[in-house]
Amino acid sequence: MSLPTGEGFGLNDNILETNVINLAVVVGVVVFFVGKNLTSILENRQETILNNLREADQRASEAREKFNKAKEQLELAEQKAKQIRSEGLLKATTEKNNCLTQYEQDLARLDEYKQETLQFYQQKVFSQLYVSLVSKALQKVKQKFDKRLDNQFHITVNNFFIARFTEYNP
């Protein structure tokens, strides 16, 4: 199969050129009319994106501020907790010392009371013993006088010693 000269492949070159021209005109019209709208849409989209970026920056800035405030509040809370802990330890130590002091004072008072009680009972026993010894001594003296002396001498001596013992205060 051979092709005749001058006819080519059988394509109509004229139609191809017309199609290219028509395509160029359509593209030009589309660019002319749609280009403004497309530019407007792109500008609106760009403006929306920029606004979103500004809002995101603003929200990020607010978030940073809130984070910093929260961080400061956390530091203040930690300081307050440390202060409360140290005050609690100080108060516990003070209370412990007060309890120990009170215990020592109570112990000293009990010891003093014990000593006073011992002294009281010692004095009571000495007093009873003294009275018992004096009465026994008087009985022995009376017995000796009753055996050896007459009644008149006995009465004189007894009155003398009774007077002396009644004047004596231990």
Swiss-Prot record:
InterPro entries: ATP_synth_b/b'su_bac/chlpt. Keywords: ATP synthesis, CF(0), Chloroplast, Hydrogen ion transport, Ion transport, Membrane, Plastid, Thylakoid, Transmembrane, Transmembrane helix, Transport. GO terms for cellular component: chloroplast thylakoid membrane; proton-transporting ATP synthase complex. It holds the Pfam family ATP-synt_B. It is found in: Plastid, Chloroplast thylakoid membrane. The chain crosses the membrane at residues 15-35. CDD domains: ATP-synt_Fo_b (cd06503). The keyword Nucleotide-binding does not apply. It comes from the Eukaryota. It is a single-pass membrane protein. One of its GO terms (molecular function) is proton-transporting ATP synthase activity, rotational mechanism. Coiled coil: none annotated. F-type ATPases have 2 components, F(1) - the catalytic core - and F(0) - the membrane proton channel. F(1) has five subunits: alpha(3), beta(3), gamma(1), delta(1), epsilon(1). F(0) has four main subunits: a(1), b(1), b'(1) and c(10-14). The alpha and beta chains form an alternating ring which encloses part of the gamma chain. F(1) is attached to F(0) by a central stalk formed by the gamma and epsilon chains, while a peripheral stalk is formed by the delta, b and b' chains. F(1)F(0) ATP synthase produces ATP from ADP in the presence of a proton or sodium gradient. F-type ATPases consist of two structural domains, F(1) containing the extramembraneous catalytic core and F(0) containing the membrane proton channel, linked together by a central stalk and a peripheral stalk. During catalysis, ATP synthesis in the catalytic domain of F(1) is coupled via a rotary mechanism of the central stalk subunits to proton translocation. Component of the F(0) channel, it forms part of the peripheral stalk, linking F(1) to F(0). In plastids the F-type ATPase is also known as CF(1)CF(0). Belongs to the ATPase B chain family. This is ATP synthase subunit b, chloroplastic. It comes from Stigeoclonium helveticum (Green alga). The gene is atpF.
